[in-house]
């Protein structure tokens, strides 16, 4: 509360979650301090990947739901490590969903202009660039209407999962061994965490050179490898079986994203 307005912060996170606006973890917002206020406020900006539309994009990762979406944000990472703050967000989400962002309120807003807009998305130039022409239009409308409740369900599911983490980009050579490492995950319930790691010569992880499961440490050591490019995939699971991926991805121009 010294530097940020907590209610503003919670409203911003909760609104983005309910509207499924995932591309807000480290961008697409302004930080603003008005002249008559000594605290910083977060102003929303850019919702073009919200309302379920972003989930069809290839840059959206499996971890992007609920609090995990913001785990790479240092401020929110520190804030949500405290259970009291998680409880505040849950209360804020439930309040906003009950009063403002739900199936009924979204339907009311869509009813004001959905039929008017439909005639234009069928015509040039929109019909050349929008993926919601023809029979898809009504299904898109229904997807928007159901976004808040599905987002809230994903939020509850994400609370049980370990949080995503970063893998280290370089393998350190030490005493004739290459060390492959990653950051430690975090579990909101304090469950024990176990890592599964695979190292391969290809991004599809088909040419495997090392594999181990149920590791408690956040590194593995393998005998010195030949010079070249190697790929590592690490996942984490808690003691009751909830799993999570790392933040990392790689885009291969020939075979796609991993």
What are these regions (language model features)?
Residues 185-206, 243:
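Solvent-exposed loop/turn segments flanking beta-strands in beta-repeat/beta-sandwich domains
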Residues 240-258:
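Extracellular fibronectin type III
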Residues 33, 199-203, 236-238:
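Residue-level signal for short segments within beta-strands and strand-turn junctions
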């Amino acid at each position: 509360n010294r530097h940020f307005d907590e209610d503003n912060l919670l409203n911003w996170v909760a609104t983005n979650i309910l509207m499924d606006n995932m591309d807000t973890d480290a961008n697409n917002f302004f930080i603003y301090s008005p002249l008559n206020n000594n605290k910083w406020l977060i102003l929303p900006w850019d919702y073009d990947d919200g309302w379920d539309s972003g989930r069809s994009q290839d840059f959206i990762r499996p971890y992007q739901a609920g609090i995990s979406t913001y785990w790479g944000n240092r401020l929110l990472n520190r804030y949500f490590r405290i259970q009291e703050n998680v409880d505040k967000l849950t209360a804020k989400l439930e309040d906003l969903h009950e009063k403002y962002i739900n199936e009924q309120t979204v339907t009311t807003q869509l009813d004001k202009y959905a039929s008017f807009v439909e005639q234009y998305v069928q015509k040039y130039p929109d019909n050349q660039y929008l993926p919601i022409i023809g029979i898809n239009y009504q299904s898109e409308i229904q997807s928007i209407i159901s976004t808040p409740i599905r987002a809230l369900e994903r939020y509850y599911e994400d609370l049980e999962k370990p949080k995503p983490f970063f893998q280290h980009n370089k393998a350190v050579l030490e005493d004739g061994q290459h060390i492959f490492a990653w950051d430690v995950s975090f579990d909101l319930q304090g469950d024990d965490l176990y890592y599964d790691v695979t190292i391969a010569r290809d991004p599809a992880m088909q040419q495997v050179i090392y594999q181990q499961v149920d590791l408690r440490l956040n590194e593995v050591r393998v005998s010195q490898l030949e010079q070249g490019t190697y790929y590592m995939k690490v996942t984490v699971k808690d003691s009751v079986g909830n799993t999570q991926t790392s933040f990392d991805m790689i885009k291969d121009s020939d075979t796609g994203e991993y």
